[in-house]
Amino acid sequence: MEDFTNLLAKNARQIGEMLDAKLSSHIEAGEIARPSRLLAAMRHGVLNGGKRLRPFLVIETARLFDANIEAAQCVGAALEAIHCYSLIHDDLPAMDNDDLRRGKPTVHKAFDEATAILAGDALLTIAFDFLSDDKLELDAKIRLKLINGLARSAGLGGMVGGQVLDLEAETKKPDESGIITLEAMKTGALIRYACEAGAILSNATREDRERLSEFGAAIGLAFQLADDVLDVTSDTKALGKTAGKDIAANKATLVALHGVEWAKHQLEGLMKQADDLLVPFGNKADILKATARFIIERKN
């Protein structure tokens, strides 16, 4: 198997190229103009590095079923556009109020707040441009399932709803169950969708789709838990964003509730859960197992 780090980097380049092409100055059918400042802000927010982990999960779950990888990349690019829009909005003064993202000024710092809001809005629509493009050759029912799943994972009952719960938690502290729900929505929903999408693309069985959904839920919680540990134990240079923000904002996290050592123990448990869920897929799931390990051992 090709070195995991190289695989992840290769995928990041490919997804970056797809997003770069979509965010060119070329006016597409149905558009009137592409304002240069808005386009520059979108490019700043989406082409500023990143691991592209969510697209990687779409592609690698699709490989389990020998699905069309070009289609999986397209779905992955759509998902990454939504993820990047969420980061732009998350960094705004009204929310996390952060100056750095991936070691560079956040979009509202590089441009202004209004432009950052609109850049995020436009990236959200780009996602559905990817999925509805007739160049993406998909069965209509599969396409609709992908669009519907992404909309629900990103919206009221998923990522956006989780962000609201996160803001509310600054003043009204949730218990452990409430924090897990918050994190499953804010962070986990898009990761779970990434793992489901590969199965949807392949028209996999309900059992396989549900198994991958559970895998996505486990690594989604692990991702957020690892993030919360890093916020406490790492520094701004290593993270590429301001360290210690959760403590300063008095945010409700499992690390704040139980401590770092408890969190590290939980991460190992989630890793085992993720591995167990992949057993039926045999050696074809080795890269997904490596991805789960990467999530809990990453440094940023």
Please report, for each region that a protein language model flagged, where it lies by residue.
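N-terminal amphipathic/basic leader segments beginning at the initiator methionine
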Residues: 1-27
